[in-house]
Amino acid sequence: MPGIKEIRTKIKSVQNTRKITKAMEMVAASKMRKAQERMRAGRPYATKVREIAAHLMQANPEYSHPYLVEREVKAVGVVLVTTDKGLCGGLNTNISRVTLSKLKEFEQRSIKVQATAFGNKGLGLLTRIGAKLVSQEVQLGDKPDLDRLLGAIKVQLDDYLEGRIDALYVATTRFVNTMRQEPVFLRLLPLSNGLDDPFQSGVETLAKTAEIKSDYSWDYIYEPDAKSVIDDLLQRYVEGLLYQAVAENMASEQSARMVAMKSASDNAKKVIGDLQLVYNKTRQAAITKEISEIVGGAAAV
């Protein structure tokens, strides 16, 4: 059985650890609220872009943008979104597992893969497995910089437009609520006919929106022309989805970290209680032994 001094040292060590995890829990809770606000702030933008695009495409049915054209898949691009830091439970492990499964599936179908990594954890994974990296962006901080994200993803978008890849996927963690985050592997390009927002449930698709708008006889005045406006809108829409993927992951990261640190703090409290019980028993045993020795010595005299 460990001595009293050793147990006291362990209790002190666990108490110090609990102070750290408690502080990290509070910091994560504060960052989580801000990350959720940023994540939700981008959703109305995507919804409005979908509505405008629906109207434009209905008014110009003869025009087909490359982002909407299905083609035989021989090569794909994958954007893996992870965190830069750990201590967020199984967040990175879960999305890594899903991504590896999909990459194996592509390999079995003889489909070439080129990857973009957002976050140190994803970069480390793709490097270890020897994936073809065409771009990367790490140390994104607590607030994603759109210019940095677009700079990294431009390679993939250009390759898609030039036909070097036939589809573009994004692997990220979708924020459901504070206690639940789910890894998702979504096709970004070509866009589905409905232009569904992969990060919202119950949102109208482009097709449904177009159907609703079909009663209107008005139209926009285009400058310079409708096709140019559609091109710009779809480009902004895809960029917005990529930003949303990173924002969702950041909100998920802070939520998972807060939950993980709370769990660590609760476990530390339990360990302290167990150690305190052992300490009391050990101390009581030592006192009893000393009393017995004194009584035994007095009887011998």
From Swiss-Prot:
Membrane topology listed for this record: Peripheral membrane protein
Molecular-function annotations in GO: ATP binding; proton-transporting ATP synthase activity, rotational mechanism
Taxonomic superkingdom: Bacteria
Subcellular location: Cell inner membrane
Gene Ontology annotations for the cellular component aspect, listed alphabetically: plasma membrane; proton-transporting ATP synthase complex
Keywords of this entry: ATP synthesis, Cell inner membrane, Cell membrane, CF(1), Hydrogen ion transport, Ion transport, Membrane, Transport
Coiled-coil ranges per UniProt: none
Similarity field: Belongs to the ATPase gamma chain family.
PANTHER family xrefs: ATP SYNTHASE GAMMA CHAIN (PTHR11693), ATP SYNTHASE SUBUNIT GAMMA, MITOCHONDRIAL (PTHR11693:SF22)
Function: Produces ATP from ADP in the presence of a proton gradient across the membrane. The gamma chain is believed to be important in regulating ATPase activity and the flow of protons through the CF(0) complex.
HAMAP family: ATP_synth_gamma_bact
Protein name: ATP synthase gamma chain
Organism (species): Bordetella bronchiseptica (strain ATCC BAA-588 / NCTC 13252 / RB50) (Alcaligenes bronchisepticus)
High-level lineage: Bacteria, Pseudomonadati, Pseudomonadota, Betaproteobacteria, Burkholderiales
GN (gene name): atpG
